[in-house]
């Protein structure tokens, strides 16, 4: 079900609500949510369209539920960032992006253009850094912020003004992280969530962490010592063990991992909150895009909703 009425409003929202979407990871989730139907999702030109379709469904669901006054979809600009300059193997070893997914990316951006949604990328930075920077700017300006991603890196940004939603299953199921929920689930604060990643590493991003420290051990250390810094301040008092030996040997690696895992909230972005006002789609061109993609049901729903609004 697609809720087109939700994005055909005229933007007259009383409350300032910012929706920030990690475009690359959400698109990837959309691709695999409909992967079993990959061959069914092709347009007349032979383009695979499952990621585009799934991304549209996710957007429609979020727009209807969040009702943002402002919105941005952030993308990664490329594989080279300030983090790869710091650690060449960062995100190394990832599997090749499927061609069926790669070919859809330009059309996801085109979809956003027709929907009237701003998208942005910044050389040398990741989508997370763009999101983190705008999140802090929006907090200072009195916004309520919803961040949506396909992975958990952005959980570190949750606070009293910011909810971080992680895509779980399909195109409409999300797990919402607030500071209270994070404490309830893991016993950690958002700042400690970064330290946990520094300790245990992250295989998906190829962040090394400390040898043989997993989630359970990492949480135990943080509950005892408060932070990564606290662990090393108290390490001399720890009883002799293989874990202590690994912590000592991998100290430099642990602090490098923390730097790699920490989102930059002061990225030199060239856009501001005033550029992110959402006032709805270009219905005519969005309809033409649906025709090109072969999205008959979406086109029909768009026509019905736009007629009702008119």
Predicted regions and their residues:
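Electropositive phosphate-/nucleotide-binding environments in soluble metabolic enzymes
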Residues: 49-52, 102, 125, 254, ...
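Short helix/loop capping segments that flank catalytic or ligand/cofactor-binding pockets
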Residues: 29-30, 157, 299-300
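Low-complexity, acidic/Ser/Thr- and charged residue-rich accessory regions of DNA metabolism proteins
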Residues: 13-17, 246-250, 259-310
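Extended two-metal-dependent nuclease catalytic cores across DNA- and RNA-processing enzymes
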Residues: 9, 15, 39-42, 92-269, ...
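Domain-level signal for Mg2+-assisted phosphodiester chemistry and nucleotide/NA-binding surfaces
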Residues: 13-118
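Generic domain-boundary/flexible-linker signal
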Residues: 82-84, 156, 271
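Short, Lys/Arg-enriched N-terminal segments with co-localized hydrophobic residues
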Residues: 1-12
């Amino acid at each position: 079900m697609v809720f087109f009425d939700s994005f055909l409003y005229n933007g007259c929202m009383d409350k300032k609500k910012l929706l920030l979407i990690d475009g690359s990871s959400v698109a990837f989730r959309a691709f695999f949510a409909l992967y079993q139907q990959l061959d069914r999702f092709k347009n007349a030109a032979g383009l695979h369209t499952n990621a585009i379709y799934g991304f549209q469904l996710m957007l429609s669901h979020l727009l209807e539920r969040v009702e943002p006054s402002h919105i941005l979809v952030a993308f990664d600009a490329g594989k080279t960032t300030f983090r790869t300059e710091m650690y060449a193997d960062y995100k190394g070893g990832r599997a090749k992006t499927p061609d069926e997914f790669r070919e859809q990316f330009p059309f996801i951006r085109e979809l956003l253009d027709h929907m009237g949604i701003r998208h942005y990328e910044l050389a040398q930075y990741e989508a997370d850094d763009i999101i983190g920077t705008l999140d802090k700017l929006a907090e200072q300006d009195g916004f309520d912020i919803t961040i949506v991603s396909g992975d958990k890196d952005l959980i570190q940004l949750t606070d009293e003004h910011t909810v971080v939603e992680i895509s779980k299953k399909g195109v409409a199921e999300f797990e919402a992280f607030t500071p209270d929920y994070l404490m309830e689930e893991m016993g950690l604060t958002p700042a400690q969530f970064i330290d946990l990643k520094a300790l245990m590493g992250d295989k998906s991003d190829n962040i090394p962490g400390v040898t043989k420290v997993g989630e359970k051990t990492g949480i135990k250390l943080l509950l005892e010592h408060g932070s990564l810094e606290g662990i090393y301040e108290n390490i001399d008092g720890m009883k002799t063990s293989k874990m202590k030996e690994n912590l000592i040997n991998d100290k430099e690696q642990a602090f490098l991992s923390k730097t790699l895992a920490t989102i930059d909230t002061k990225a030199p972005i060239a856009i501001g909150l005033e550029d992110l006002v959402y006032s709805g789609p270009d219905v005519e061109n969005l309809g033409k895009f649906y025709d090109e993609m072969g999205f008959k049901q979406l086109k029909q729903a768009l026509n019905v909703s736009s007629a009702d609004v008119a």
